[in-house]
């Protein structure tokens, strides 16, 4: 198990290793499932997690030191009081996504391909937990784990958050955007969603004000310029800048890098 400390004597527990808290292979039907079926899948995952922790806490085959350590922990008393102190919602890392005007891929993550119309940037590891468990030649094998470090931030294309023109003209999708499995594993982090959410909001305003609501007609360069100007003028010495100057400086360094990469990509076209 992977433990990450949190405030108020709490921790965030995550999967680690070949056999851990991930119920590998049991979520495949979730995207197309009915609400009733999703509830059944949720309960299966809940039973699996509870059972794993109970086994590690009580079974005498588990080393006493591990059992003693687990015995110190329990569900958070001040959270989800109407659901046994456990979240009623599964954490969905990845689900159905739009196929937009372009698809973000591994090549974009590694810098082999650079987009000319950035709407934001991403920089997290290409990350996927195992997706399946199989028996091969009498041996149990997990399949699908990906952990590939990304050296530099890369741009996310505006075309990846907007649908093809013949499908919709008033839709922008910053979360379930157009990306391959590998690329989405890098883009799907909350800080990246925050950047995309803000820039997509600005793009929506631009579409309404100047393009009769047609998102495909918006110039991503105009949006990114407004994004940079807005953050510089509205929060030049704000809370984040004063408490976390390194993070704030890195934020604008990434913004400048996004502009430079886009300029180079346009010149190469």
Where are these regions (language model features)?
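Flavin (FAD/FMN)-binding glycine-rich loop and adjacent Rossmann-like elements that form
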Residues: 1-266
């Amino acid at each position: 198990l992977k433990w990450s400390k949190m405030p108020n004597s709490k921790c965030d527990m995550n999967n680690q290793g070949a056999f851990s808290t991930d119920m590998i292979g049991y979520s495949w039907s979730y995207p197309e499932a009915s609400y009733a079926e999703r509830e059944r899948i949720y309960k299966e995952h809940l039973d699996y997690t509870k059972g794993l922790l109970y086994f590690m806490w009580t079974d005498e085959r588990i080393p006493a030191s591990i059992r003693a350590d687990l015995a110190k922990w329990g569900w958070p008393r001040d959270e989800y009081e109407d659901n046994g102190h456990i979240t009623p919602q599964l954490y969905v890392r990845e689900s159905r996504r739009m196929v937009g005007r372009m698809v973000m891929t591994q090549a974009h993550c590694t810098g082999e391909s650079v987009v000319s119309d950035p709407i934001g940037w991403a920089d997290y590891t290409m990350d996927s937990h195992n997706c399946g468990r199989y028996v091969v030649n009498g041996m149990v094998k997990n399949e699908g784990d990906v952990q590939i470090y990304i050296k530099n931030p890369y741009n996310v294309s505006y075309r990846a958050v907007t649908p093809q023109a013949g499908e919709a003209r008033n839709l922008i999708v910053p979360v379930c955007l157009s990306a391959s499995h590998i690329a989405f594993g890098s883009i799907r982090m909350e800080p990246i969603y925050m950047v995309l959410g803000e820039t997509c909001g600005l793009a929506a305003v631009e579409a309404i004000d100047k393009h009769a609501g047609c998102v495909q007609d918006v110039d991503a360069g105009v949006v990114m310029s407004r994004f940079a100007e807005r953050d510089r003028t509205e929060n030049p010495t704000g809370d984040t800048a004063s408490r976390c100057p390194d993070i704030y400086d890195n934020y604008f360094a990434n913004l400048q890098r996004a502009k430079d990469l886009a300029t180079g990509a346009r010149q190469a076209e």
